[in-house]
């Protein structure tokens, strides 16, 4: 039985609420909380049972025939989320907003979050030592605007990229950007290349009205960069229901003060992973990374793939290292924090 053939008046009250919710999230798998399980129905059940190797069953919902259904235990959510995201799906998490034991009638449920490739934050799923950016790109026909956000740290960056597709692709690959937000008019051939060759998830969105928390643009004056950054922030807030209260001021990246390394150079020099096994362990990053925190590890990686060529910045880093070498008590205190 297909969902499009079902009339709301014919189904049970619970299924009626499910169908109303599902109609707002077409093209997204809906995990619908029922007791200790997240249930999927109709086409979502068919897809999930196949992709996750779940048993497909049926449910009586007031109709003459049973509707397709499958489910997962709520405590195993992250395991199944990771598998679906890796396969390129978006998942809407619909939770019970009331205690079923104390509620009379239908329990109120709401979609509290939509999870996609660029919005995974659970330590059980993401590698906290690596970037996990979601980005937006605008094509100005002479230059690209690129903005990218890390939901774990709340950091947001924006920059211009020269009008060269290979340079743009290299930067996206080097930054390990998982998901890209673009407008419908964006170059479809370039998007296909990113999706098929580099497993980048593509989402379409058009709202680039300046983000409501305009104070995040305190250091940004360029209208093109503000609009492009607003595109990804509005998408996260409005479409994916993400809480961005921890988002920091947007940082402008001046690409002219960094040595430009393309993806092939980083790959062949084994700067962040080995050629043969794609492992971090025996790469340059793996040998150098003695950091104590995941944030420190991500910072070190950014230094390796984008070496500074600014003399003042290089000397400042050297001075900081020398200070820690000279003041071992300070170093010990910092380590213990």
What are these regions, as identified by a protein language model?
Residues 1-298, 303-305, 311-329:
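Basic, polar low-complexity surface loops/patches
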């Amino acid at each position: 039985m297909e969902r499009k053939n079902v009339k709301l008046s014919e189904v049970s009250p619970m299924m009626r609420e499910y169908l109303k919710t599902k109609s707002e999230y077409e093209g997204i798998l809906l995990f619908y909380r029922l007791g200790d399980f997240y249930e999927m129905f109709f086409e979502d059940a068919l897809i999930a049972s196949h992709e996750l190797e779940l048993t497909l069953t049926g449910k009586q919902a007031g109709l003459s025939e049973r509707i397709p259904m499958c489910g997962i235990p709520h405590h195993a959510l992250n395991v199944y989320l990771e598998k679906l995201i890796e396969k390129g799906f978006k998942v809407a998490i619909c939770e019970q907003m009331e205690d079923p034991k104390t509620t009379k009638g239908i329990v109120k449920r709401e979609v509290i979050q939509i999870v996609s490739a660029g919005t995974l934050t659970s330590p059980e799923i993401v590698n906290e030592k690596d970037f996990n950016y979601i980005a937006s790109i605008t094509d100005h026909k002479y230059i690209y605007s690129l903005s990218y956000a890390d939901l774990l740290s709340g950091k947001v960056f924006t920059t211009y990229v020269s009008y060269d597709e290979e340079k743009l692709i290299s930067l996206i690959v080097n930054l390990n950007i998982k998901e890209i937000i673009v407008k419908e008019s964006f170059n479809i051939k370039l998007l296909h290349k990113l999706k098929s060759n580099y497993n980048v998830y593509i989402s379409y969105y058009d709202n680039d009205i300046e983000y409501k928390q305009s104070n995040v643009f305190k250091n940004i004056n360029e209208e093109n960069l503000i609009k492009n950054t607003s595109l990804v922030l509005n998408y996260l807030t409005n479409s994916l229901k993400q809480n961005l209260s921890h988002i920091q001021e947007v940082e402008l990246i001046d690409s002219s003060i960094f040595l430009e390394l393309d993806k092939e150079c980083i790959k062949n020099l084994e700067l962040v992973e080995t050629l043969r096994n794609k492992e971090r362990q025996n790469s340059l990053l793996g040998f150098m990374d003695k950091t104590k925190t995941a944030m420190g590890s991500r910072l070190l990686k950014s230094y390796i793939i984008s070496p500074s060529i600014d003399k003042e910045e290089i000397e400042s880093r050297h001075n900081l290292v020398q200070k820690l070498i000279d003041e071992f008590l300070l170093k010990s205190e910092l380590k213990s924090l």
